[in-house]
Amino acid sequence: MNAPDSPPPAARPVGLFCGLAVVDVIQLVEAPPAPDDKIVALDQIIAAGGPATNAAVAFAALGGRAILAAPVGAGPLADFVRADLAACGVELIDCSECSESTARPDCPDRPDCLEPALTADAVDSAGAADAVEGLDGVNAVSAMSAVSSAAPMASGLSISSCTVTAATGQRSVVSTNARAGADPAPLERYASQVAAGRKSPPGIVLIDGHNPVLAAVGLDLAARVGVLSVMDAGSWKDDAANLPGCCDVVAASARFYPPGPSGLMAAPEDVAHWLLDAGAHGAVITRGADPALWWCAGARGAVAPPRVEAVDTLGAGDIFHGALARGLVGARRGDIVGPVLGAAVERACAVAAASTELFGTRAWRQRVRGRGN
């Protein structure tokens, strides 16, 4: 209880993350297997993954209230993803397509589209601690059994097979990406509740280029409430080619190659100019351990990530984008100037670098929990 003269606690900033949710099965290996080879992993972890999902987890770890809009569905895999998200403090708007065989909890007409995260008190309780322990791989056997027992089409969720090389932290990923069909209706219902004043509006909206039908609803909501929209552009996706021009800030990887008059663009400055010409007000290009580059409003800059001994780089880009969203939450389009964007990129680089020092996409949160702007 607050002391009589103490001010009420400030509300956590809200971030809406629209895109992809998958199941990441992560193996730590001495070296990737050769063709027709079998190897024994050094460690294993299973966690919910996907660009928007990992960004939402990062936003929550940094003290924000994260809401993820993604198709999850029903079945053992979906149950596992829900448990992981709840343990990480992420609320879910399940945007899976309804069917008789895989009905989501809010189908057909659940009044409240948000599936709650665990509260801070619950996360500190023994039961939640046991759940988090299993999700972080200490008790991964039960989680792995859920994957192995799931019918192949039970939920439509994709499984990403991820290997991480112990000596370098480099990762390799195989995934079918957005296999589950997306239904925008639950997200539209949330947007209507925001418009009616029944739900808190987001202070920022992030899209990841997957499930463009959800991106369209998220971007429309951002425009209506007057908050920034951020795109994790990752690598180039043909079906998301029109999205960068609809976003205020676009963060792309060094493998984002938009089409140009003479072929694919690869030089960072050419890519940045393409993004700005398309309509973005700020552009960021991440390059792993090399300096992240940013451009906006006639300004530009470079931020060198902290030097760390990388153990696992899986999800570092997603975590960067979640931290970037946390740094920009509450800003408006006119605020995208050099000092603001540069500072947000610098903070995001620090968080992403810290995430690579531990194996898996969850353990790093203990080091930065609650470290907001």
Over which residues does each language-model region extend?
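Short beta->alpha connector loops
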Residues: 74, 209-213, 233-237
